[in-house]
Amino acid sequence: MSKIPSVNIKELLDAGVHFGHKTSRWNPKMASYIYGERDDVHIIDLRQSVALMSVALNAIYETVKKDGKILFVSTKIQASDIIAEYAEKCGQYYVNHRWLGGMLTNWKTIAGSIEKLNKLDKTLENEEALMGYTKKEILDMSRKKDKLLLSLAGIRNLNSKPDLLVVIDTNKEHIAINEAVKLNVPIVAVVDTNSNPDNVDYPIPGNDDSIRSIRLYCSLFADAALQGLEESMKASGVDMGAMQEHTDKALTSKNVSKLKQAKKFSKTKNIDEETNTEFEQALNDADENKNSDNA
């Protein structure tokens, strides 16, 4: 059986996943995922992040294992290239520049735009056909193609609604989330301290701005999808060979000073004692590192 990827507290801490937003910008609905605060910045409870990431990765794995389609969505600058890279790595779909209203709920219109893109592609690749156009007309077609590619490159082969939506930054991608909710498409999403987790089926508390954090999430998502694909292919009698293992990250630990501890909440039941100890120790180690650096 394929091994679903996992992550530990140290990996999350090293990637800066625990850093939320300023306390003044928080969404009270995220209270249950917040461990405390430091210098007016909320600190995310990584014990819950570990547990909920595991649940989300299993959802991704099971979706692909059952031949489902996953749509990755994040149009923010720091996530755009990373989302495309890892979605392509695991053979899934993505939107990484601009979410066009109706991408899910008005698929007929989007399909028409994809058809237009494919026709432009076909024309521009046909040297004989291009002889019938002026240079200006060819330039106009190239510009139209490039504009369409920005929005549609990652979904041009998506023939129906996805079976799972994976989102980084629920605030920025609220239109995509609303459309998924209308169509009953389950949602995996990284939820920062200023996010609303209400419509998210598989929330992952974490920093949604740090490039290192985003790369870690996407690497895990892609690995889970690849493991699901491996199982799907095995069930079909196809030997895919060795799958690429999760790449170890050589990340530098972030320093965390003494925390002003908030009231403890937990939406993830039965966080084991080992995880509690690991989290407390990781924070203490980071604290000691900072103190020694300042000595």
Swiss-Prot record:
Q: Which Gene3D superfamilies match?
A: Glucose-6-phosphate isomerase like protein, domain 1, Helix hairpin bin
PROSITE patterns tied to this protein: RIBOSOMAL_S2_1, RIBOSOMAL_S2_2
Q: Where is this region: Disordered?
A: 263-295
Enumerate the CDD domains for this protein.
Answer: RPS2
Coiled coil feature spans: none
Q: Which Pfam families match?
A: Ribosomal_S2 (PF00318)
Record's signal peptide? none
> Could you tell me which InterPro entries the record lists for this protein?
Ribosomal_uS2, Ribosomal_uS2_bac/mit/plastid, Ribosomal_uS2_CS, Ribosomal_uS2_flav_dom_sf
Mind listing the UniProt keywords for this protein, alphabetically?
A: Ribonucleoprotein, Ribosomal protein
GO annotations of cellular component type: cytosolic small ribosomal subunit
Q: Could you cite one Gene Ontology molecular function of this protein? A: structural constituent of ribosome
* Biological processes, Gene Ontology terms: translation
Top-level taxon of origin: Bacteria
> PANTHER family, from UniProt?
30S RIBOSOMAL PROTEIN S2 PROKARYOTIC AND ORGANELLAR, SMALL RIBOSOMAL SUBUNIT PROTEIN US2M
UniProt cross-references to HAMAP family, sorted A to Z = Ribosomal_uS2_B
Family indicated by similarity: Belongs to the universal ribosomal protein uS2 family.
What name is this protein filed under? Answer: Small ribosomal subunit protein uS2
Q: Which organism is it from?
A: Rickettsia massiliae (strain Mtu5)
Give the lineage.
Answer: Bacteria, Pseudomonadati, Pseudomonadota, Alphaproteobacteria, Rickettsiales
Identify the coding gene. Answer: rpsB
